């Protein structure tokens, strides 16, 4: 048997919040702030957004490792946060997240149309998230009522290591029956999500305006003056630079042109690992 490069995409692995649902990725961000507040520790929205894309326990651990947050915690408890303290915050985060996830469950404009177009081209729709399964089950149910169902879903606690490790993306490859990771594209609004796709050997598309990096509602994004939007794009492109996404676009609505370009590159023999 001989190896031959794939000639076209077989699967798109989509993130959830900030990619397909919850424009601006507000659901997890606000709950991190509220969970810490229940321990009398202040965390700003900006701080909470920093590690977005990681599994939620790891996200809280990363926040607790910030010198400023660790010092605020020490002033309240007389020590810096241990892993047991992180778990206590996580266990408060979970019910808050489940309770309030519906408030930020709307599909991102253009998502349904783009996903239908991908399926029309024979592309399977995988998905993964920094949410644990308990939260994802509710997110998936809410999305289904709005017309979106992925072919496969992998939550962060269903693999040994979440993002930026490649396990969730690769679990989709296995479940969807894809024969080559180079025939897959990972779409995400966070750096850990892009690193996940890169490390899995996939094409990667960073979404700059619908998710965590811009952090605005759809209406807020649409209302930005052209020079402000250009400045924000430049800032966000720099944030993603080290993770080396193959493409950067505003939102999932811009994805069809990218899919067409990747298929052309595959047909020419190009591979994601070589770019």
Swiss-Prot record:
Gene3D superfamilies: HAD superfamily/HAD-like (3.40.50.1000), Putative phosphatase, domain 2 (1.10.150.240)
Cofactor note: Binds 1 Mg(2+) ion per subunit.
Needed co-factor(s): Mg(2+)
Positions of the catalytic residues: 15 (nucleophile), 56 (schiff-base intermediate with substrate)
Protein family per UniProt: Belongs to the HAD-like hydrolase superfamily. PhnX family.
GO (cellular component) term, any one: cytosol
Enzyme class: hydrolase
Binding sites annotated in the UniProt record for Mg(2+): 15, 17, 189
Pfam families cross-referenced by the UniProt entry: Hydrolase (PF00702)
Physiological role: Involved in phosphonate degradation.
NCBIfam families, alphabetized: HAD-SF-IA-v3, phosphonatase
Protein's UniProt name: Phosphonoacetaldehyde hydrolase
Keywords (A to Z) from UniProt: Hydrolase, Magnesium, Metal-binding, Schiff base
